[in-house]
């Protein structure tokens, strides 16, 4: 984690997980049970970024803002691997699929699914309870009650998963140590 001038990361959480190689810079607010996974970059260098409780930001995600366009990620949100979020708002209990892109001033409502590889252009409003697919993203249909249940389960899974990682993740320091402990065999 890094400060940038007066912009500082604010941890409002009793419990959270930020992977060692994730980068969190500037005005970023991390709430309870947030997990920020490996190689994610959260850059609050221009405007604040707030990440709601029980939200997970998966491996390789980039979150950034432009001046005058702060960012809000709601509670219980799942941001899939390699997604790109830029100056947008994501409602509670939504999922942004793998490699999706959401641009400045776009608003994704609550209980939404933005499919993998979808693009939500600048200023686009996605109503609550929508399934969005494509480039540019289009509302295909309303999400089902079963899908809403699964959105909640996804967020809960990542809360349990980060606790497992906090407890059990250990760095393997040197190859020599690995060989001595017979974790790997010699050639």
Residue ranges and their predicted role:
Residues 1-13, 45, 53, 59-60, ...:
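Glycine-rich hexapeptide-repeat left-handed beta-helix
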Residues 11-65:
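A positional/architectural concept
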Residues 68:
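Short, Lys/Arg-rich nucleic-acid/phosphate-binding segment
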């Amino acid at each position: 984690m890094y400060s940038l001038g007066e912009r500082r990361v604010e941890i409002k959480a009793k419990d959270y997980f930020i992977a060692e190689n994730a980068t969190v810079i500037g005005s970023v607010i991390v709430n309870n049970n947030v997990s920020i996974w490996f190689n994610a970059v959260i850059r609050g260098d221009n405007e604040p970024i707030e990440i709601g409780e029980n939200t997970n930001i998966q491996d390789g995600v980039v979150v950034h803002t432009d001046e005058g366009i702060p960012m809000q990620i709601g509670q219980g949100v799942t941001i899939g691997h390699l997604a790109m979020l830029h100056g947008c708002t994501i409602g509670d209990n939504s999922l942004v699929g793998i490699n999706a892109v959401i641009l400045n001033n776009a608003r994704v409502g609550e209980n939404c699914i933005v499919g993998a590889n979808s693009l939500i252009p600048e200023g686009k409003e996605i109503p609550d309870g929508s399934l969005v697919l494509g480039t540019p993203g289009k509302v295909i249909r309303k999400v089902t009650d079963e899908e809403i249940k699964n959105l909640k389960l996804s967020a809960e899974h990542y809360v349990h998963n980060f606790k497992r990682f906090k407890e059990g993740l250990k760095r393997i320091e040197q190859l020599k140590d690995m060989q001595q402990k017979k974790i790997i065999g010699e050639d």
